[in-house]
Amino acid sequence: MSAPTVVRRPRRLLPKLLRVGSRGIFGTLGIRLRGRGVIPREPALLVANHLSWTDIVAVLATHECTFVAKREVRRWPVVGWLATHLGVIWTDRTRSRSLLRTIADIEATLRGGTSVLMFAEGTTGDGTQLLPFKSSLIEAACRAGAPVVPLAITATALPPVDALCWVGDQTLLQSIPRVQRLSMPEVQLHAAPPIAPVSCRKVLTQMARDAVARRTRGGAIRARDRARSDATVRVSAALS
């Protein structure tokens, strides 16, 4: 097996700039952000469901971490450069050896003091149901002795709310205008209590999925009730 790549920790100033920038992106798009629960400051593996590119923006707006991304993103203009300097862990789904390297890189990142976000479904969903969680990468938390934090991502908007989802062959440039046309969109982050890495990865994976499922019951994408849409929603201080 080849040696794991050297994991680059995010530069000290960059996460702060990304937090401000991410909140600015949501402000520009008119997306409100709300948080529930507490994401620990200690290094943790954040295990989330996946709806859209807005998921990453939401997490970066509230918590300092890096994340696992497919290698193709590295070639995207601007986004690829930012991701590389954030210390993103690249993975190649077409190569089995890449999985072992990704696990080693996540472990090294956690041991180095940085939390890692992974989307356990392995792809984006349409928000109607939770897809099966893949357990392989959660092995890294067991090796590093880091807690697993289930993170449920939900969203609401006035119809057509499914414009928040990024599915199929839709490109990022096609998705952004759809999100801009939404009325009263809101993204919610629901952090469940941390799970100690004391069990095998398959048990941990099921526990994480169950926690996310409880917080996305009824669908991760919901139509907003216009009568309840007047209050200004701010990011929870607990997630700051």
Model-derived features: where do they sit?
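A short, well-structured juxtamembrane/interface segment
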Residues: 17-44
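A cross-family acyltransferase "interaction/gating" segment
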Residues: 79-80, 128-207, 218, 225-226
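A membrane-cytosol interface segment of integral membrane proteins
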Residues: 89-110
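Catalytic-site beta-strand/loop segments enriched in glycine and acidic/polar residues
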Residues: 109-138
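Polar-ligand-bearing catalytic/cofactor-coordination segments
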Residues: 90-92, 192-197, 211-214
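Cytosolic-facing loops and C-terminal tails of multi-pass membrane proteins
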Residues: 213-240
